[in-house]
C-alpha cells in the first residue's frame, strides 16, 4: 500500500518474540512518535516538548500519561457512560514505571515541559503493554529533538522452577516466584521494581544482572533505529540546552555560605536536632544568606537558592563519606529508634501503630465477605482482587497546609508497593475465606513511609488474627558514591532521600525478599555494591522484624468480636436455584431474617458471613434444608399436609421462614399392606408418620411409601396380637 510517507520498520527478537518499532507511519506531528509491537501487543508512544523553558520553577516538568483503551482487549467499558474516564490504578502505576528511568536522563537545568503519551491499542496478555510502552517511550524520545541522554531498554524477569525467564508468558508468570522489571541504559541499571515470593538476595542480584544483559540488546537496537531514522528524515537533531553557569555568583555564594552551612550542620548533629528544628534552623540561615546576596544580585533569587541547596547537599554527603556520620548523628547502618503498638482501635478488626524515628504509620485491617472483593475493570485478565492495601498521606503528616482531593499518583504508587510486599504472605481463600483491606494512615513523615506501611500492616494483620505465612518488614536504603568512596545508608530519612545516588526500598520476611523498588541516578553501581547494599538492607530488616515481634509474635488465635464469621459449605450447583428462588426471593428472605451476607459461587461454594455466630448457623441450617437431598430408600418422619382421593401429601423436610419444605406423595396404594378404601381411614392431616422415599416420577416429583416404612410382620402383629395362655400352677 502506498502512503506517500517515509516509513521505517525494524525488529529484534526478545525472549523468542519480535519487538518491532515503526516510525513515520502515524502521529508524525509529535516531536517523536513510535508504534511499538511486541507480539500482538501494540502501543503508540509519542514525545512532545515545549519550545521555551517554564519560568520560576526548580524542577523538570515531565508528564507521562498511560492511556488504556478497552478496544485493545475487545471490551466495552462498564458503567453508564461507556467510555474511558480517569486512569485506572494500573494505568497510573504503568505511567510511573515509564517516568522513573527516563526522568534522570535529562540534563540538569532543563526546564522545558515534556509530555510522553503511551496509548495502548492492542493487547496480548503474554506480552505486557507497559513493557512495550517503556521501550516505546525510550525510542520516541531518542527520535525527538528533546535532549534525552538515553536510550533505555526494559524487560521483565521471572523465576520459573528456579530458572530465570525473560518476559514470561501468562502461563509462566502464574508459576513464577518473581516479577522483576529492569530498566537501564547500555552502561547502568536505572530502575528496578519487583514483587517476589521470599526470593533470596543472591537470586535477586542474579535476576537484575540477567535482565540488564537483555536491556543492553534493546538499547543497541534503539540506537541503530535512530541512525536509520536520521537518514530518512524521521529523527531530529537534538536541541542544545544552555544552562548559564554564573560562575562569579556561584563562587561568591560558596565562599561565604559554605563555612556557615557547615557550622550549622555540625551544630545540628552535635545537639541532635529533630526534623522540625533542623529544617527551621537551616531555612532561617539560607533565608538570611539569600536576602544578603539579593542586594548584589537582585534578579537571581532562584539561582542563589539552588546554590545554597547544593552546598548543603555537598556538606551532608561529605560528612557521610569521610566520617561515616549522618545529619541526625547515626552511623550509616543504624536504624532509627522503633516502637510499636497493636489493638489501638477497639471497634476495628485489627490495628497496628509503627513508629520509626519521626515516621509514624497507623494501619487498620478490615475483614469482609467474599462478595466484598474489588471488581477490576481494566485491560488485565484478573476480574477481582481479595487483598487490598490503601495508603493515605495527609498534609498534616509533614506540618503543611494543602487541599485534600483524594489519592495522587504518589499515594497510589506507595500503596501498591506495600501491597506487593504483603501479598505473598496472605493466606489463600481456601484457608482464610475473607476479603482483606488494609488502610495505612501516615501520621508523621520523615522518610520511608511506604516501608513503615508494610511494618504497620503486618502488625495489624497479626492483631486481626489473619494467619499470615510470615511477618514482613521493610526498610528504605540509600547510596552515596564519589569515585571509589561508597557509603550505603540504612533507614534513610527525608533529607537523605534527595542527596543520594541510589535509593531503594526492600521488604521481606526472614527468608527472603517480597518487594523491591530501586532507582539509580548514576552509572558505576556495580554488582558488588548492589550485593553489599542488599545484605545491609537484610540486616536492617531483621532488626526491625525483631522489634515488631517483641510486641506481637504471631497472629491472634481469635478474630475480633466485631469481625464477621464466615461459614463455608458446598452444594450441588444444580441446587443453587433452590437457594436463590424466583427473582432472588428466597435468598433475600434468608438475608432479611438472619442479617447475614451470603455469597454463592457458580461451582456450588457458599460463604455465609455473620458477625453473630448464631445467625450464621441459622442461615446455614436454612440452606441445608433447602438443598437437602431426599435419599431414595431412606425412611423419614414426615407430616401429612394434605389429603387427596388418590393419596396423602407428606412433608419430609420442614419449611423455614415461611418457605415451603420438601414433600412427596404417598399414593393410596402405598398407605398400608392391606387394601385401603379411603385415605382418611389410615391418616389424617397433621399426622406424623414414617415414610420411605421410593423414587421420583417422570416429572421429578418425590414418591413416598408408608407401607414400605412399616415391615409387614409388624402390621400382622398389630392386627393379630399373640395370645398369651395363663401358666398352670405348679408348672
Curated annotation (Swiss-Prot):
Mg(2+) binds at residues 497, 503. Keywords: Cytoplasm, Magnesium, Metal-binding, Nucleotidyltransferase, RNA-binding, Transferase. GO terms for biological process: mRNA catabolic process; RNA processing. Residues 564-623 form the KH domain. Residues 633-707 form the S1 motif domain. It comes from the Bacteria. It catalyses: RNA(n+1) + phosphate = RNA(n) + a ribonucleoside 5'-diphosphate. NCBIfam families: polynuc_phos, PRK11824.1. This is Polyribonucleotide nucleotidyltransferase. It comes from Carboxydothermus hydrogenoformans (strain ATCC BAA-161 / DSM 6008 / Z-2901). The lineage of its organism: Bacteria, Bacillati, Bacillota, Clostridia, Thermoanaerobacterales. The gene is pnp.
Amino acid at each position: 500500500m502506498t502512503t506517500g510517507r517515509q516509513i521505517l520498520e525494524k525488529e529484534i527478537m526478545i525472549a523468542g518474540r519480535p519487538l518491532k518499532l515503526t516510525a513515520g507511519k502515524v502521529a508524525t506531528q509529535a516531536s517523536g512518535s513510535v508504534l511499538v509491537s511486541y507480539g500482538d501487543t501494540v502501543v503508540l508512544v509519542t514525545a512532545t516538548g515545549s519550545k521555551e523553558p517554564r519560568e520560576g520553577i526548580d524542577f523538570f516538568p515531565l508528564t507521562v500519561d498511560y492511556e488504556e483503551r478497552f478496544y485493545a482487549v475487545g471490551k466495552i467499558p462498564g458503567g453508564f457512560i461507556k467510555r474511558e474516564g480517569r486512569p485506572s490504578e494500573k494505568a497510573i502505576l504503568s505511567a510511573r514505571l515509564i517516568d522513573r528511568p527516563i526522568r534522570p536522563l535529562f540534563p540538569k537545568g532543563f526546564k522545558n515541559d515534556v509530555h510522553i503519551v503511551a496509548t495502548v491499542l492492542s493487547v496480548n496478555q503474554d506480552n505486557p503493554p507497559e513493557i512495550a510502552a517503556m521501550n516505546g517511550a525510550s525510542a520516541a524520545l531518542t527520535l525527538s529533538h528533546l535532549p534525552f541522554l538515553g536510550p533505555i531498554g526494559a524487560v521483565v524477569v521471572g523465576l520459573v522452577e528456579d530458572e530465570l525467564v525473560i518476559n514470561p508468558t501468562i502461563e509462566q508468570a502464574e508459576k513464577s516466584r518473581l516479577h522483576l522489571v529492569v530498566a537501564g541504559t547500555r552502561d547502568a541499571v536505572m530502575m528496578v521494581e519487583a514483587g517476589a515470593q521470599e526470593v533470596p538476595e543472591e537470586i535477586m542480584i542474579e535476576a537484575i544482572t540477567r535482565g540488564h544483559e537483555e536491556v543492553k540488546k534493546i538499547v543497541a537496537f534503539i540506537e541503530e533505529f535512530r541512525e536509520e531514522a536520521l537518514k530518512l528524515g524521521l529523527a531530529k537533531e537534538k536541541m542544545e540546552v544552555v544552562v548559564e553557569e554564573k560562575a562569579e555568583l556561584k563562587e561568591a555564594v560558596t565562599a561565604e555560605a559554605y563555612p556557615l552551612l557547615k557550622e550549622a550542620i555540625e551544630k545540628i548533629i552535635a545537639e541532635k536536632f529533630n526534623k522540625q528544628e533542623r529544617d527551621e534552623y537551616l531555612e532561617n540561615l539560607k533565608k538570611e544568606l539569600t536576602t544578603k546576596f539579593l542586594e548584589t544580585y537582585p534578579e537571581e533569587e532562584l539561582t542563589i537558592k539552588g546554590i545554597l541547596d547544593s552546598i548543603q547537599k555537598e556538606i551532608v554527603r561529605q560528612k557521610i563519606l569521610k566520617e561515616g556520620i549522618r545529619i541526625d548523628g547515626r552511623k550509616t547502618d543504624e536504624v532509627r529508634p522503633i516502637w510499636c503498638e497493636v489493638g489501638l482501635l477497639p471497634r476495628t478488626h485489627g490495628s497496628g501503630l509503627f513508629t520509626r524515628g519521626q515516621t509514624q504509620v497507623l494501619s487498620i485491617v478490615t475483614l469482609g465477605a467474599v462478595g466484598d472483593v474489588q471488581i477490576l475493570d481494566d485491560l488485565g485478565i484478573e476480574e477481582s482482587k481479595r487483598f487490598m492495601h490503601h495508603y493515605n498521606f495527609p498534609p498534616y503528616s509533614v506540618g503543611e497546609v494543602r487541599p485534600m482531593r483524594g489519592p495522587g499518583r504518589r499515594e497510589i504508587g506507595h500503596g501498591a508497593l506495600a501491597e506487593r510486599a504483603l501479598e505473598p504472605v496472605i493466606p489463600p481463600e481456601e484457608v482464610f475465606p475473607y476479603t482483606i483491606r488494609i488502610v495505612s494512615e501516615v501520621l508523621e513523615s520523615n522518610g520511608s513511609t511506604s516501608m513503615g506501611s508494610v511494618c504497620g500492616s503486618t502488625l495489624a494483620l497479626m492483631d486481626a488474627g489473619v494467619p499470615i505465612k510470615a511477618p514482613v518488614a521493610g526498610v528504605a536504603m540509600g547510596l552515596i558514591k564519589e569515585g571509589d568512596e561508597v557509603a550505603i545508608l540504612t533507614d534513610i530519612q527525608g533529607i537523605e532521600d534527595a542527596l543520594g545516588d541510589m535509593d531503594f526500598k526492600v521488604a521481606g520476611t526472614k527468608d527472603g525478599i517480597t518487594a523491591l523498588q530501586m532507582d539509580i541516578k548514576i552509572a558505576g553501581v556495580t554488582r558488588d555494591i548492589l550485593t553489599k547494599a542488599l545484605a545491609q538492607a537484610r540486616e536492617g530488616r531483621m532488626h526491625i522484624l525483631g522489634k515488631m515481634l517483641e510486641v506481637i509474635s504471631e497472629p491472634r488465635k481469635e478474630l475480633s468480636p466485631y469481625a464477621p464469621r464466615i461459614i463455608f459449605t458446598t452444594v450441588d450447583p444444580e441446587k443453587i436455584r433452590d437457594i436463590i428462588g424466583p427473582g432472588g426471593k428466597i435468598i433475600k428472605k434468608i438475608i432479611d431474617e438472619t442479617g447475614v451476607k451470603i455469597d454463592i459461587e457458580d461451582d456450588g461454594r457458599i460463604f455465609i458471613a455473620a458477625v453473630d455466630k448464631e445467625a450464621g448457623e441459622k442461615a446455614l441450617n436454612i440452606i441445608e434444608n433447602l438443598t437437602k437431598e431426599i435419599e431414595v430408600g431412606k425412611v423419614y418422619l414426615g407430616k401429612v399436609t394434605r389429603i387427596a382421593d388418590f393419596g396423602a401429601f407428606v412433608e419430609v423436610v420442614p419449611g423455614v421462614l415461611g418457605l415451603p419444605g420438601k414433600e412427596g406423595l404417598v399414593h393410596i396404594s402405598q398407605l398400608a399392606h392391606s387394601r385401603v378404601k379411603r385415605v382418611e381411614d389410615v391418616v389424617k392431616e397433621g399426622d406424623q408418620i414414617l415414610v420411605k422415599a421410593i423414587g421420583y416420577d417422570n416429572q421429578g416429583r418425590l414418591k413416598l411409601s408408608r407401607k414400605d416404612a412399616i415391615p409387614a410382620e409388624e402390621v400382622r402383629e398389630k392386627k393379630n396380637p399373640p395370645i398369651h395362655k395363663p401358666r398352670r400352677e405348679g408348672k
